[in-house]
Structures are given as C-alpha cells and as structure tokens.
Regions:
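Glycine-biased, small-residue-rich flexible motifs in mid-sequence functional cores and linkers
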Residues: 3-161
Length: 161
C-alpha cells in the first residue's frame, strides 16, 4: 500500500477544486496515463447494458491498448467494466468508498485482488473506514476527476444529467 500525497495524485485529479489531500493506493497502474476513461452507470444494469459495456471495452482494448479504465467496484456497470478490462489485458483501477482493508461488496473480492496486480485500488479513506452512503458520493468525485470525460453506461432514468 502506498500513500499518495496531493502532489503525486493523477494530474487530472490535481486540477479538481475538491481533490483529496492524499490517497491510499494498492496496485501498479500509472495513474497519469495519456488515456484514462471512467465507466460508471447503474447498479441494476440490463443484459443489454452489460453486453454494450463488454463490447465497448473489447473495442477499446484494440484501439487504445494503453488505456486505464477507472470505476467504483460497485454492482452493475462498475464491476462489469472492471472485469471486461481485466479480460482484455487492460489495467483497471477501482476507487473505493471505504478503507483498503476491506472490499465492498464482498462478492467482488476476487476481482479486486486481481486488480491489485493489473491496475489497482484507490481510496481517500483510512483503514477501518466502512462503506457509508456519503462516502460513495465522495468516491464519485474521484472517479470523475481521474478521467478526461465522464462515461455513463446504462444510466438509470432518474440519474442527473
């Protein structure tokens, strides 16, 4: 595990007004890649949404094999984009809403372990910090701040534009 002070954060994230002062990081991915895409969407994705997500990452791996895929390790589009990236040999970083000493949801533990050697896990929360509703909102600003543009997949109808 590394502690990344503000000056070592990804250059994109440092430009955000509300960038965290430090991040805890476990992994090997370069957070300052030329190409970084975030993939976020509903936790209750459809089969069509999963398929489109998979096909997009398959194509992305061919066109831009050095891209870093960033998401939140949550149910739905998040976990499907992480797994698609791993399956295509792409690095993927999961931004957590809790400390690095736990994985939430537990069902994603095996994927998270694989990500530490093919990407990484990143959080602003100290160990023993539990997943809490407000932490997910704080996590989302990091996911958004790490990429050049947001990427919404299978967005729920009630999501903000």
């Amino acid at each position: 595990m590394f502690v990344l002070p503000r000056y070592r954060l990804s250059s994109r994230l440092r430009e955000c007004d509300d960038a965290p002062l430090l991040l805890y990081y476990k992994g090997n991915a370069d957070l300052n890649r030329t190409h970084v895409i975030n993939m976020v969407g509903t936790r209750h994705c459809t089969e069509y949404g999963k398929d489109i997500c998979r096909r997009f990452v398959d194509e992305l791996a061919t066109l831009c094999p050095d891209v870093l895929v960033v998401s939140g390790l949550a149910y739905g589009i998040d976990i499907h984009s992480h797994r698609a990236a791993l399956d295509n040999g792409l690095d993927t970083v999961g931004v957590l809403a809790h400390g690095l000493d736990q994985i939430y949801p537990r069902l994603h533990r095996d994927t998270a372990i694989q990500m530490t050697s093919q990407g990484g896990l990143l959080t602003e929360f100290m160990s023993r910090t539990n997943a809490d509703k407000v932490n997910f909102v704080r996590r989302n600003r990091i996911v958004a701040g790490m990429a050049d543009a947001p990427s919404w997949w299978n967005r729920p109808k009630r999501a903000a534009h």
